[in-house]
């Protein structure tokens, strides 16, 4: 009996002690209290400014926030001032969430008072998730805010400043900085962008049947440089006036083909196949005037300088891109003209010095002049190969170079004498011709060498980019970015450095490993369409290749832009600083 009494006493005591456990019920805030929402309209009616006050312990999903105008299919992109946090969610896995207040911007045209905007968002707390919440806002009912939210710009990291941005940003601190472009041009003269101009200048000065004197050589070189400077000056004026990137236009396939035909014609004329001259009737009228001049080739030197400027400018380098960006941002015609003129003048000074000092050590004129003239004909033929390789399929580049090199070595061997040192050079030239002809043999006989099969049958890179067509699609894609950063690659089929990025940099295993944590986007700029131009104007893109990086708020990371080719190691280190 005592045991039975003790048993019931313990049972009732346990129920009494734990009665509060069954009576207690966990309560959650209402959705409007957990995520207090408000919205205003900017004074220019281009921004709908949204604000969420998030209660402690609650969070909003970044990818669940959306907005659209009622009756229109295009969603509005969101740009937030706060960074999202990574959160391990029991329902969705690893997601990006906001745990504090949010200030966001929806861009659009909110001019019609009767238009309505639907804003949808969803949040959770520990142990409980709210269904998606939708707010329908009438534009005419929104309060107009005098304070316009400015999109957040990530602070500049000097370790990440590209050469282009350093140049463009630093130039605004000094009115005299434009004269630094003269020094910049001196260095740029020794880059691959300008090297093709040296043979052209030499062909004009020493490729004559008569040996030019010092004054004539200087005059021809000076006019050549002034022609080149005029091209760059006009380029600076155009960029300053309308801000459009003319490098893209100059790299259009039609322009490349036209320049190639021009240089082939010039090369053939140097081989003696024909003579390029004015019609006889016009030439006779100009004979009297030309006889008064030191030579009739001065106009040709000036014109060739202009052409050389066009050939060099499509080769986008970081200094030239920075100069154009500086000019575009200044919007001043005088600054644009002087900046590019000084750049071209600096590039031309080494050419003039080389011409003058080279001319002094030349031997007396003779048959060797025809050999030199024909040699420069081959140099001119190299320019069409270089230009056409940008627009032809990749397999054609080695074939064109092989054909040109083979013909050159055979021709060079035939120029050598059969005695002594000349005979040795002849044998070496024929041997080199046998080596350079191999790509042509592979093509003709369809033998699959390792190099050819690698180019034609194997993918260059396993990297998969999401293709973007316009700015609207870019904004939508960035808003849904599941990674910490996004990369936008501006690519074109005619861009040599773009192909080098794909073949040499993006294919690197270390770079591909880093790409797993980056949203990879790509825009084809091949056709230079209106959508392409809109993207270039929005991001001040001056040429290709250009690679942009964006943060979690869909803003370009200041100083992270890459212009010009970068090898795998350098590019990997660049990305490492961003991740």
From Swiss-Prot:
Topological type in the membrane: Multi-pass membrane protein
Biological function: Required to facilitate the formation of correct disulfide bonds in some periplasmic proteins and for the assembly of the periplasmic c-type cytochromes. Acts by transferring electrons from cytoplasmic thioredoxin to the periplasm. This transfer involves a cascade of disulfide bond formation and reduction steps.
Encoding gene (name): dsbD
Record field: transmembrane: 178-198, 230-250, 254-274, 296-316, 337-357, 368-388, 397-417, 420-440
GO cellular component, one term: plasma membrane
Annotated catalysed reactions: [protein]-dithiol + NAD(+) = [protein]-disulfide + NADH + H(+); [protein]-dithiol + NADP(+) = [protein]-disulfide + NADPH + H(+)
CDD domains: DsbDgamma
Keywords, sorted A to Z: Cell inner membrane, Cell membrane, Cytochrome c-type biogenesis, Disulfide bond, Electron transport, Membrane, NAD, Oxidoreductase, Redox-active center, Signal, Transmembrane, Transmembrane helix, Transport
Main enzyme class: oxidoreductase
Chain ranges of the Thioredoxin domain: 449-579
Cytoplasmic topological domain: 199-229, 275-295, 358-367, 418-419
Residue pairs linked by disulfide bridges in the UniProt entry: 124-129, 193-315, 495-498
HAMAP family per record: DbsD (MF_00399)
PROSITE patterns: THIOREDOXIN_1 (PS00194), THIOREDOXIN_2 (PS51352)
InterPro entries registered for this protein in UniProt: Cyt_c_assmbl_TM_dom, DsbD_gamma, DsbDN, DsbDN_sf, Thiol_diS_interchange_DbsD, Thioredoxin-like_fold, Thioredoxin-like_sf, Thioredoxin_CS
One of the Pfam families matching this protein, by short name: DsbD_N
Domain of life: Bacteria
Family: Belongs to the thioredoxin family. DsbD subfamily.
Subcellular location: Cell inner membrane
EC number(s) given by UniProt: 1.8.1.8
Protein name per Swiss-Prot or TrEMBL: Thiol:disulfide interchange protein DsbD
Organism the protein comes from: Haemophilus influenzae (strain ATCC 51907 / DSM 11121 / KW20 / Rd)
A GO MF term: protein-disulfide reductase [NAD(P)H] activity
GO biological process, any: cell redox homeostasis
Ranges per topology, Periplasmic: 17-177, 251-253, 317-336, 389-396, 441-579
Residues making up the signal peptide according to the UniProt record: 1-16
């Amino acid at each position: 009996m005592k045991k039975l009494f003790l048993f019931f006493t313990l049972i009732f005591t346990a129920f009494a002690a734990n009665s509060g456990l069954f009576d207690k019920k966990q309560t959650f805030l209402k959705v409007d209290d957990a995520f207090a929402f408000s919205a205003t309209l900017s004074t220019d009616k281009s921004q709908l400014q949204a604000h969420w006050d998030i209660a402690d312990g609650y969070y909003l999903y970044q990818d669940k926030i959306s907005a659209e105008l009622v009756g229109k299919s295009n969603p509005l992109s969101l740009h937030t001032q706060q960074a999202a946090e990574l959160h391990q969610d029991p329902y969705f896995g690893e997601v990006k969430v906001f745990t504090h207040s949010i200030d966001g911007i929806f861009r659009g045209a909110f001019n019609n008072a009767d238009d309505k905007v639907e804003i949808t968002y969803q949040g959770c707390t520990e142990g409980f998730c709210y269904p998606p919440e939708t707010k329908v806002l009438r534009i005419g009912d929104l309060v107009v805010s005098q304070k316009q939210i400015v999109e957040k710009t990530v602070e500049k990291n000097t370790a990440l400043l590209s050469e282009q941005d350093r140049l463009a940003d630093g130039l605004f601190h000094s009115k005299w900085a434009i004269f630094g472009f003269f020094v910049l041009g001196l260095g740029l003269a020794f880059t691959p962008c300008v090297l093709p101009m040296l043979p052209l200048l030499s062909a004009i000065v020493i490729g004559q049947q008569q040996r030019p004197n010092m004054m004539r050589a200087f005059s021809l070189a000076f006019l050549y440089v002034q022609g080149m400077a005029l091209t760059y000056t006009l380029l600076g004026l155009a960029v300053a006036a309308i801000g459009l990137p003319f490098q893209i236009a100059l790299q259009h396939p039609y322009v490349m083909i036209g320049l190639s035909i021009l240089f082939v014609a010039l090369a053939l004329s140097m081989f003696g196949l024909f003579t390029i001259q004015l019609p006889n009737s016009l030439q006779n009228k100009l004979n009297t005037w030309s006889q008064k001049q030191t030579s009739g080739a001065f106009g040709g030197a000036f014109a060739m300088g202009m052409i050389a400027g066009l050939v060099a400018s499509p080769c986008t380098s970081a200094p030239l891109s920075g100069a154009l960006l500086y000019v575009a941002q200044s919007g001043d015609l005088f600054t644009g003209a002087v900046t590019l003129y000084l750049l071209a003048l600096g590039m031309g000074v080494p050419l003039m010095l080389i011409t003058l000092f080279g001319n002094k050590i030349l031997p007396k004129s003779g048959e060797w002049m025809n050999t030199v003239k024909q040699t420069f004909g081959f140099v001119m033929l190299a320019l069409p190969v270089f230009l056409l390789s940008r627009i032809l399929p990749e397999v054609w580049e080695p074939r064109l170079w092989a054909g040109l090199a083979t013909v050159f070595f055979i021709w060079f061997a035939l120029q050598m004498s059969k005695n002594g040192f000349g005979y040795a050079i002849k044998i070496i030239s024929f041997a080199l011709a046998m080596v350079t002809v191999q790509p042509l043999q592979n093509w003709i006989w369809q033998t699959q060498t390792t190099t050819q099969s690698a180019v034609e049958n194997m993918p260059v890179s396993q990297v998969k980019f999401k293709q973007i067509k316009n700015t609207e699609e870019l904004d939508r894609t960035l808003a849904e970015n599941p990674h910490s950063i996004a990369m936008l690659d501006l690519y074109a089929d005619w861009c040599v450095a773009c192909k080098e990025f794909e073949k040499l940099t993006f294919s690197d295993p270390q770079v591909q490993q880093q790409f797993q944590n980056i949203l990879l986007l790509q825009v084809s700029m091949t056709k230079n369409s209106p959508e392409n131009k809109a993207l270039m104007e929005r991001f001040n893109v001056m040429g290709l290749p250009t690679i942009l990086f964006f943060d979690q708020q869909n803003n370009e990371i200041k100083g992270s832009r890459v212009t010009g080719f970068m090898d795998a190691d350098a590019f990997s280190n660049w990305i490492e600083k961003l991740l």
